[in-house]
Amino acid sequence: MQGLGKAKGINIKAEEAYGTSPENVLRSAKEKQKLFKDKGTVQIYCLFDKDDCDDEKFKKVIQQCKKAGFADVISVPCYEYWLLLHFKRTNQPFRDARECCETFQSEYNKKFQTLYTVKQLKAKTDIFNDLKDNLDSAIANADSLELEENNCPYTNMHSIIGKLLKYKIRN
């Protein structure tokens, strides 16, 4: 996200949550909202991976997110599903996040002829640079799938990316 923001001249700041659980992401967003209250126009996006979170608990957190005025960006089972869409259109059901990550790892390594582990790919800070040439494909792949929030897989990451792409660089 930050790579795209930099390319478009938008200040995107990814903040660490107290953990990756949906509850912790929401709690962190509420605290950041207080910090940015008097800083002008700030839109807070909460990026959620469903991972192993209970369905009802996950739905409740998403409702609270919307009620607080945050934009929710959801990936089921995980963020790596969005990354996978840069390589292929798939609505293959995944048993869990690990299977999705391994599928992304395989596609990434095949494309770039590398031998990254899942852990190394998750830590990669310049992944936008690697995938930016496939961004339009990822958006088209996500748009073409029958994606519903309670499906696995699901992502609405392309909606935030589409908004960012509409911004013009301001001088």
Listing of model-derived features with the role each one plays in the protein:
Residues 2-16, 23, 30-45, 50-171:
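C-terminal accessory helical subdomains adjacent to catalytic cores in phosphodiester-
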